[in-house]
Amino acid sequence: TDVDDDGWLKTFTIPANGSSITAVASLEFATTDGKYNSLVKLDADTYVNAWQASSSKGKIGTYTIPADGSSITEVTTLVHDGSSITGYNSMITIDANTVLLTYTGESDDGYLKTFAIPADGSTITEKIVLEHDTNYSGFSSVVQVDFDTYALAYRNSNYAGAIKTFDYSLTAATMNPRISTVTIAADNSTIAVTMNEAVY
């Protein structure tokens, strides 16, 4: 977000030793308002950004960025909340084609949403919508705990820090097979691996 509240995406090259930072490509993705951004990587060259757009609408977009960062190409965008949102976006990738977004919506209520996005970023489809706090939810930060559990930290209506956990079993049922936990015995003799589905 620049001095005029316009939204920008930029790429930089940084060598392994961190000795320099070189600007490579840039894209002004929002010429009016592009605030409270949250950017995640969906796959090798597809990125997803959520932000507060003009008229305080909630918007999400996909972008193609090659590994060398030589270009930034907008693929598609979606206004997912047409009301007046406050922002405070926090988004994570939860599966190969799914992102989870938390944000402060209309009347400062707290929302969680999931979106289905194909590998090429050509479409954005809203799937799950949950209003998790009807009083106030600000300064959100969401993390993944395991394959279907997520933890959200935020400021509530009492100006206190709050943490909530969410279990999306419906979403987890459609996820690709993956390791959910790994436990090493005290004597390092065995490793117990638990998958997110039955293994035969």
Question: Language-model features: where?
Answer:
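Low-complexity, Pro/Thr/Ser/Gly/Ala-rich linker/spacer regions in secreted
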Residues: 168-186
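Surface-exposed or flexible loop/turn and strand-edge residues in extracellular/cell-surface modules
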Residues: 24, 179, 188-190
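Extracellular, repeat-based ectodomains that mediate carbohydrate processing or recognition
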Residues: 1-172
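A short glycine/threonine-centered beta-strand motif
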Residues: 188-200
